[in-house]
A protein has these predicted regions:
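N-terminal amphipathic/basic-hydrophobic helices that include classical n-h-c signal peptides
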Residues: 1-14
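Long, low-complexity, charged/polar intrinsically disordered regions in eukaryotic proteins
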Residues: 30-101
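Long Lys/Arg-rich low-complexity intrinsically disordered regions in nucleic-acid-associated proteins
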Residues: 69-71, 105-109, 124, 138-139
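An alpha-helical, amphipathic repeat domain used for nucleic-acid recognition
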Residues: 97-114
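Short helix-coil junctions and helix-kink-helix linkers
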Residues: 114-136
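Short amphipathic alpha-helical interaction segments
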Residues: 132-148
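A short, conserved structural fragment
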Residues: 147-158
Length: 160
């Protein structure tokens, strides 16, 4: 019964998914966050492990289309495109290098805590959400990727 519930403590290893990075076109001379992250992800074979501000691991995978990525912590479709990082960096620049992460779990887009000038609000707008809509909050993963790439610091409650 424990085996059926996956509670038996078995030693089976989960094989990582096979990733084809050959279709990932990267501009290695670009200063855009999207291109920097794509280049680093491609250099790592299309799979990395990043860590949240709390130290929890997140698996990141390049998708075969060469323009999007997924994570074991982001169960949403369609996959996120790399350009979301350009929007986040643009927000950081507009706000003098600091931006509140915001909260998409408890608030709808545009409500206090989930405003357009927060990281979660910026991501929601990038995904085509409109004011008043519920949003998925992927900031913990996006912030971890930005920190891994050396683009921003994943601070408590804010990106720096």
């Amino acid at each position: 019964m424990l085996a059926a519930l996956n509670l038996g403590g078995g030693t089976e290893k989960v094989m990582p998914k096979e990733i084809d990075v050959s279709r990932m076109d990267v501009d290695y001379t670009s200063t855009l966050a999207s291109e920097i992250i794509k280049a680093k992800l491609k250099a790592h074979g299309g799979h990395i492990t990043v860590y949240t501000a709390r130290g929890l691991p997140c698996e990141i995978y390049a998708e075969s289309d060469g323009t999007t990525f997924t994570s074991d912590k982001l169960p949403v479709k369609p996959a996120y495109d790399y350009k979301v990082f350009d929007d986040i960096v643009e927000l950081l620049i507009k706000q003098g290098g600091r931006a509140k992460k915001g909260n998409g779990r408890n608030y709808k887009l545009g409500e206090p805590g989930c405003e357009e000038n927060t990281v979660v609000g910026t991501i929601a707008l990038h995904r085509g959400r409109t004011i008043g809509e519920s949003v998925f909050d992927p900031v913990f993963v996006m912030a971890a990727i930005l920190e891994w790439a050396g683009i921003a610091e994943n601070g408590r409650g804010e990106l720096i």
